[in-house]
Amino acid sequence: MTSKNKYFSTISILKIITYLLFVLFVYEKSYKQDYFNYDGIPYVASAHMLTGEGLVSSHAYAWNLLRSKSQPGVFNDLCCASSYRKSMYQSFEAFGSHLPSYQTKSLYVLTVRVISSLLNIDEFEALKLISFASVILLSFLAAFFLFNKSFILYISIFPILILMQIIPMARLLTPDSFNALLMFSAATCFLSQKKTAGYGIMLASILVRQTNIILFALFLLFELKERKYLKLIFYASLGLLIYFLNSSLFESIGYWKTYYSSLIRMPDTFVGFNPPFELSLIYSTLIGKLNWMLGNPELNRFPALMLILLSLSLLPLKEKSYWMIEKRLVPFIFTIGAIISFALIPFPDFRIYAGFLIAASLSLIANINEKRLTDKAR
């Protein structure tokens, strides 16, 4: 065995060990711990309804299952910490009026149902398993896709994932880690010039978070750049069809009710809830939330990371030839997608946009041409 092969083997083993240590770390900090958050309850009810049960029984099932699995203090917090939660707990009608916000994540809810049925575990366990498995698969995909990079670049995957809040996402009973897996899966397809597969994953992701249609539309600019107008029309029509069919099937509460209830005032029930639309409120809320987040040490990571990633993704594009190379545009598109999504609904919650930023960060690493950097240094 030559010294070069020995070096390669040693580095490869170190890379594998690093990944396995990261998996163990994630397991210890997430899956091994019991954790419940409110959003898990309507997802459990939504998945239970796929068995043919109605709203009344699914409402009772979700809350009773939570009571049987959680500590009394946790249950009391999730059922009664606010007037909204009390209403969701006490009234199946109020609970059902907000359920479409969760049911429209239809691919995620279906995955919960399938995992629960296949493994014979309850829906809370299925939610927990999906979040953990998504993070493990995401980190594996990143490790595999970037395995041929230098050890220095390869090892940067893991602190980046930690910085992007992957540990709390691994234990949250929400679709955020699942969405992040889909985002980076699509990114690897676009980076590998497999656009059809990338579009397919992006279309599926609309059924996990409907705002992903924004990112899908941005990637369709590839077809516009190449003047493939029929493909552009086809994919755009397919994306809109999936979006509106999903919204119609689950009676989505719509953009403005989501915006108002999340950022202005959460009602105790969505029955009869119809706040008047105010365009000026969108602008003032965006400025107010951004100003608050920048001054908050727990929240300013997100706008700072968006600006850093935007700068880094624009840096290679100063060379005109790079604008013609689609894989060079991938980090930029993911970052712009996060910025637009935040501008439309500025949730002060990093996990909502983490999938976009994880994909942007890892795509930047994938695009680093180490040989070219070495040649320039010489």
Roles of regions detected by a PLM:
Residues 229-316:
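Membrane-lumen/periplasm interface segments of specific transmembrane helices
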Residues 187, 196-210, 215-222, 238-241:
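Membrane-interface alpha helices of multi-pass inner-membrane proteins
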Residues 52-104:
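Interfacial juxtamembrane loops and adjacent helix segments
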Residues 168-178, 349-350:
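Short acidic/glycine- and proline-prone juxtamembrane loop motifs at membrane-interface regions
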Residues 141, 178-197, 359-363:
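Specific aromatic-rich, kink-prone transmembrane helix
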Residues 140, 292-325, 335-339, 360, ...:
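Hydrophobic, aromatic-rich transmembrane alpha-helices
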